[in-house]
Amino acid sequence: MPVDVVAPGVLRACAGGTNSYVVRTDDGLLLVDAGLPAHWRLVGEAVRRLGAAPRDVTGLVLTHGHFDHVGFVARAAERLGLTPWVHEADAPLVGAPYSYDHAMPRTWYAVRHPRSLPLQVAMVRAGALAVEGLEIVRTFGGAGPLEDVPGHPVALPTPGHTDGHAAFHLPDRGLLFTGDALVTLDPYSARTGPRVVARAGTKDADRALESLTALPPGEATVLPGHGRPWAGRVEDAVAAARRAGVA
């Protein structure tokens, strides 16, 4: 389903194998990640399904600045007046979302993991080659609640995938948005289950594995940047990711 309910008051919009989330809070609707350009229409559908209107969207947080997570930031700024929040180390990347380092060349992965090709094609069809960045952002530097963001999500820096990657936690609701720090579908290998993203899309795989310690233990619904939600103890998902290693 392109749009589905993943937790009470939370809808996931999925296009090109990438997830964007719409979260109902007491302070308005919060968007977590801006996906690809195709997500714009799907997020609008999710807002309507929550019985809300575009004017009710009052916040946008980005787990990181890669092109497949900032796909509609420019449109959200223009049409909704939203300025996205992102870790300060990834702020330049939001403005230039294709200009990032990765540990291994992607062409090698396409040959070695042919099952990932349909995912890559789906990303292109969802607008992966036509993402417009945004230079005006709001930033945070460390861990802690974002008081000016609806729902006051707790930012959890999880560097490795990018220098400024961060997860977001809503502890009172048991929701953990992990972006690409912890996924259940690796878009470069097509492998499923809790894991970190392959070296084709990750700057520092060792650091990415190490930073999983920042994710709080306990029961939660883990909402990743790629793949299906995962429910259970966060430490079990982290252990599974470490066992899986990095493709």
Segments from the language model and where they lie:
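Conserved beta-strand hairpin/beta-sheet module of binuclear metal-dependent hydrolase folds
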Residues: 1-50, 54, 168-184
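Divalent metal-coordination and catalytic microenvironments
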Residues: 9, 23, 33, 43, ...
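Short alpha-helical
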Residues: 18, 38, 68, 92, ...
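Metallo-beta-lactamase
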Residues: 37-38, 128-132, 136, 145-147, ...
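Active-site HxH/HxHxD metal-binding segment of metal-dependent hydrolases
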Residues: 48-138, 145, 240
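Short glycine/proline- and charge-enriched loop/turn segments
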Residues: 101-105, 189-199, 241-244
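Binuclear metal-ion centers of metallo-dependent hydrolases, dominated by the metallo-beta-lactamase
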Residues: 229-247
